[in-house]
Amino acid sequence: LNRDRFLNKKQRDAAHAMLEAGADILDIGGESTRPGATTITPEEEIARVIPVVRELAKAAPVSIDTRNAATMRAALEAGAEVINDISALRHDVEALAVVRGSHAPVILMHMPGDDPATMQSLATYDDVAVQVTDFLAERIAACEAAGIPRGRIAVDPGIGFGKTIDHNLALID
C-alpha cells in the first residue's frame, strides 16, 4: 500500500478478484520490501495498513506483512489473523513477544540481514539450501524458546529476497 492510507477502487476490486479466484487469505503490507526499498517508520506503516486491514478483514482472513512489532500489534487488534515477517522476527526486539502474546500464526522468511535495502548485497552462499534451512531452523528454535508453539510457525525460503536467480532455482529444485 502506498501513502494514500485507504483502499482505492482498483485495489478493492483486485482484493475481491483474488478472493473470487480462490485466494484463502489476503496479505497486506505498507512498507515496500523490494530490493533497495526505502524504509518507513512504524507509525507511517500503521497509518497505511490499519484502515485497509479493518476493511478487508470483514471479507476474508488477513495476514499483516511487517517487520515492526507495533504494526503487528495494531493489525492484530484491527482483525489480522496471521503475521508475515520478512525478517523472521529479528528486526524488532518486541516482535517475538507480540507473536507469543497472540494466538496468530507467524510466517518466518529467510532474508540475509534484516533490511530490504541491503539484502541483495548479502546474497553470498556456499550452499544456499543448507544455509537457508539452517537459518529457518534457528529462527524456529528462537520462537519456541520464546514460547511460540511450533504449530503456529510457518517458514518461507524467501525466493527473490537476497538471492540470485541461481540461488532461487536451487531452492525450488
What are these regions (language model features)?
Residues 1-4, 32-36, 59, 72, ...:
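Conserved anion-binding
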Residues 9-18, 67-70, 135, 139:
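Short, acidic/polar
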Residues 13-29:
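Catalytic domains of carbohydrate-active enzymes, especially glycoside hydrolases
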Residues 16, 47-50, 54, 73, ...:
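Alpha-helical segments flanking ligand/cofactor-binding loops in enzyme cores
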Residues 18, 22, 65, 75, ...:
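Conserved, mostly hydrophobic/aromatic
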Residues 24-51, 159-165:
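Glycine-rich, proline-tolerant flexible connector loops at the mouths of alpha/beta enzymes
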Residues 36-76, 80-82:
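Active-site beta->alpha loop and helix N-cap motifs at the rims of alpha/beta catalytic domains
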